[in-house]
């Protein structure tokens, strides 16, 4: 029953920056730069619904579908800076089956902030974006935290708009050379955006396995994932493993169009994993998920994926990534800690 709106976004940026300090040492390394960035957002007035006979306009009485999103054009001049004090620990069997990877121990902070210098009539703001990474542990146990926040302080309404928050807390425990346990908690939120957008359980990165067709969505989302993985030594040329997992999630309506406060939803399942050749970082995975608590439209799901999770700590959910201001380069203050 949800509706869709036409959204057009354009962005541009130009910046310069330089590094402070020597990254080959264990001391603090910094970054400082400036950025000219701009964005244009336009949302269509009509809300439509996809039906078997084509697109159908939603009725005017549907206030959620008729919510107004004024067009916005803004150019900002910002300063970007950050620092990191990090050393790397080489571990094996965390995000890959047996391959080695570097885990960052320490702290990293990046900040970008600046006012609008040209904007749609009557609009003026100060844009702020920040990112924090922290890691601690050794080859047997490791914990990582990443938080990324952005928003615009509207100078006329004295409020915040375009708020986007993404965060992930992970814990790894290597019980033996063949046994690894992982726990991941992901919290995401969007509020007062300049265009309609919802968070849901359907997102491949940020959603719940077994809940691809529930249709529930909102402005805030919490996901807890627990996995218990065992290596199976069946072939010297490749690595194989089996894992049991459970996903638990909840949605809050927030101010998202058609947003709802969901029940606590959960699924359990079995994963078959492989890497080729033996010691390879690329992971081939089949997830078999069965919903146990939640929406009636949830159902058994088979999911295939191929990825290399050793290269970056977190691949941000797609629905959160597209909510972010397009003119903020992802590499500003966001040095990959792995």
Where are these regions (language model features)?
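C-terminal transmembrane beta-barrel domains of outer membrane proteins
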Residues: 108-338
